[in-house]
Amino acid sequence: MARLAELYNKEMVPALMKDQNYKNIMEVPKLVKIVVNMGLGEAIQNVKILDSAAEELAAITGQRPVITKAKKSIAGFKLRQGMPIGCAVTLRRDKMYEFLDRLVSVSLPRVRDFKGISGKAFDGKGNYSLGVKEQLIFPEIDYDKVDKIKGLNITIVTTAKTDAEGKALLKLMGLPFRN
């Protein structure tokens, strides 16, 4: 079992039950999944960019990404329906906890001028989205082998009903919020 999962079961659940006044252990919010997405508009001209991005995403998450395709054609972007335009990975269970642990303890501190993450990026239902400007903050990525700096989106899905519950859970998990 992942270190963060054990910590959640042994320490975070009782702390959340006490803080939020939950009567049943099933009311306590928990992580459902983490979706890591890399959108690549440049993949329209050069498909090789997509292959390198998929390799990097696999190294970061430890799981093979799925190639995302365009849902509809947009003439202004020279985009046709079904063209590959990105890649995404959905992490669950132990891999999810291990990824979050590495993100909080290793990757986020490597961001230049890091002062914490915004507490306003919740969606109203307790889920949190985070944008990373460059994939180089992850220790799995070798700086010399990177041909182009790419950003990625990380969405943390929880069972929390409100943003306050979700923020309390993620704060206990170690996410460094600014406010």
UniProtKB/Swiss-Prot annotation:
GO CC, sorted alphabetically, is: ribonucleoprotein complex; ribosome
Q: Which domain of life is it from?
A: Bacteria
Record GO biological process: translation
Q: Does the keyword Ribonucleoprotein apply?
A: yes
* Sorted UniProt keywords: Ribonucleoprotein, Ribosomal protein, RNA-binding, rRNA-binding, tRNA-binding
List the coiled-coil residues. none
Question: Which InterPro entries does UniProt cross-reference here?
Answer: Ribosomal_uL5, Ribosomal_uL5_bac-type, Ribosomal_uL5_C, Ribosomal_uL5_CS, Ribosomal_uL5_dom_sf, Ribosomal_uL5_N
Q: Which family does it belong to?
A: Belongs to the universal ribosomal protein uL5 family.
Q: Could you identify this protein by its name? A: Large ribosomal subunit protein uL5
The species this protein was found in? Geobacter sp. (strain M21)
